[in-house]
Amino acid sequence: MKGKEEKEGGARLGTGGGGSPDKSPSAQELKEQGNRLFVGRKYPEAAACYGRAITRNPLVAVYYTNRALCYLKMQQPEQALADCRRALELDGQSVKAHFFLGQCQLEMESYDEAIANLQRAYSLAKEQRLNFGDDIPSALRIAKKKRWNSIEERRIHQESELHSYLTRLIAAERERELEECQRNHEGDEDDGHIRAQQACIEAKHDKYMADMNELFSQVDEKRKKRDIPDYLCGKISFELMREPCITPSGITYDRKDIEEHLQRVGHFDPVTRSPLTQEQLIPNLAMKEVIDAFISENGWVEDY
């Protein structure tokens, strides 16, 4: 990713007591060697180089974030998380540390924490004017989507359990009433009367069951997984756009978000970095029509 955020230390070691120079590589040289290995996708070897750099100079945040990225590539989020936390102890403004920490937490399904760190990384990148392209926004969209899906799965499971519980209650109540009817008419010679009462009990509980199933079928759409397509979400807030507008570069933003960006950050397109002024923003009426239709058909988006 682009953007140089930390000042890196690790000067060469001095001469030894005997006056002969120390031939071992410096922390910076080890870091550069690790970078070359990383480019070659030799992640374990790169992580080892960054580890040696840390041993030589444990006070440089970038060594930890570089090793954390190796661990992420090797699908070892716990080790990556530890390195990210150490990097943040050294440099609380590190974009990469927050970004990689968010990715670790995303892998570990800690979605709220992941979103918080990814949002912090995005804010810091804007403040420091570092260009990470769509890397951070993309990770943030994924984290929000996974958190939403997790909430939806839990809700669907709870509704399914409720349906099963009510079904068992109705069936148990039916059996109890049928048994009570049988006991109350033991010895009666009029079997027709007993059968009529039992038929009434059966019909009553069949109606209970049918009414309940109808009620659940009416909310069937709510049981399904719900999602907002990425193309309807703003590229700054990552929320459903309400007033989409398009830039000369062809990128669509929510108006309030892009205007805030222009006022607080600078007069350029956040994605393409092209010069941009508020007067160049044009309402995207076609997208607005699509969004309005989506909202009208999916009332749940207000809670998304």
Curated annotation (Swiss-Prot):
The modification Phosphoserine is found at residues 20, 24, 26, 150, 274. PROSITE patterns: TPR (PS50005), U_BOX (PS51698). Keywords: Cytoplasm, DNA damage, DNA repair, Isopeptide bond, Mitochondrion, Nucleus, Phosphoprotein, Repeat, TPR repeat, Transferase, Ubl conjugation, Ubl conjugation pathway. Auto-ubiquitinated; mediated by UBE2D1 and UBE2D2 and enhanced in the presence of MAP2K5. Monoubiquitinated at Lys-2 following cell stress by UBE2W, promoting the interaction with ATXN3. Its EC number is 2.3.2.27. Residues 1-10 have a biased composition (Basic and acidic residues). Induction: Induced by oxygen and glucose deprivation in neuronal cells. Induced in the neointimal layer of the carotid artery by blood flow cessation injury. Residues 102-201 are annotated as: Required for interaction with MAPK7. There is a cross-link at residues 2, 23, 222, 256 (Glycyl lysine isopeptide (Lys-Gly) (interchain with G-Cter in ubiquitin)). Residues 1-30 are annotated as: Disordered. It is an enzyme of class 2 (transferase). Residues 144-304 are annotated as: Required for ubiquitination of FOXO1. Residues 143-197 are annotated as: Required for interaction with and ubiquitination of MYOCD. It catalyses: S-ubiquitinyl-[E2 ubiquitin-conjugating enzyme]-L-cysteine + [acceptor protein]-L-lysine = [E2 ubiquitin-conjugating enzyme]-L-cysteine + N(6)-ubiquitinyl-[acceptor protein]-L-lysine. GO terms for biological process: cellular response to heat; cellular response to hypoxia; cellular response to misfolded protein; chaperone-mediated autophagy; DNA repair; endoplasmic reticulum unfolded protein response; ERAD pathway; MAPK cascade. Residues 227-301 form the U-box domain. Pathway: Protein modification; protein ubiquitination. The U-box domain is required for the ubiquitin protein ligase activity. This is E3 ubiquitin-protein ligase CHIP. The gene is Stub1.
